[in-house]
């Protein structure tokens, strides 16, 4: 049975608490010559809600001379600006992460355990600001140093480094590709100070869908242990 960190999410999900978030949603069409920063700006400006499926590969550094270990999970994601999102992990373990605008909830079905944090304190300068919170590119640049990187894997890339270096997050790389509907935010790569690397790829993307309010509501299941931080 997996254990929950005393002060946070399960180890495999620590990057998601730092980010929680993360998504890849199609953007309105942008010129073919547009760079990664242009695509990011269009995403923030024009995408108010979205949903997608995702696969997450978390690579942890090896210990005592052992090679690195990689664990893969998949699930679904939805978000609505400002400040609401939901991750539902299906395999190999069921977990739910919900930000309702006030509280960040993590439910581990295997442990029947809920962790609740004040959302403003839990997110801060994290990937969630890019996906669900920041109103414009200038707001992001107050918290991140944003630089374009060379194309890789058929995608345009941006590197985002938090200006506040007091957390676990080291940097975020965001990859865009050109799809049938224009630029798509396709990949999110996150590195932390423990040497852990998380790569999320997205599929079955829907842009600006009408999402029910219940998507971003969470009620702890009966009998669940609740930890509040």
Go through each PLM region and give its residues:
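An acidic-aromatic
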Residues: 76-128, 198
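Bacterial N-terminal signal peptides
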Residues: 14-28
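Gly/Pro-enriched, hydrophobic low-complexity segments
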Residues: 35, 115, 139-229
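N-terminal leader/targeting segments and the immediate start of mature chains
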Residues: 27-70, 220-229
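Short hydrophobic/aromatic-rich beta-strand segments that constitute the beta-sheet cores
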Residues: 54, 85-88, 104-107, 160, ...
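Short, solvent-exposed helix-to-loop capping segments enriched in aromatics
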Residues: 125-139
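N-terminal secretory signal peptides that target proteins for export/translocation
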Residues: 1-12
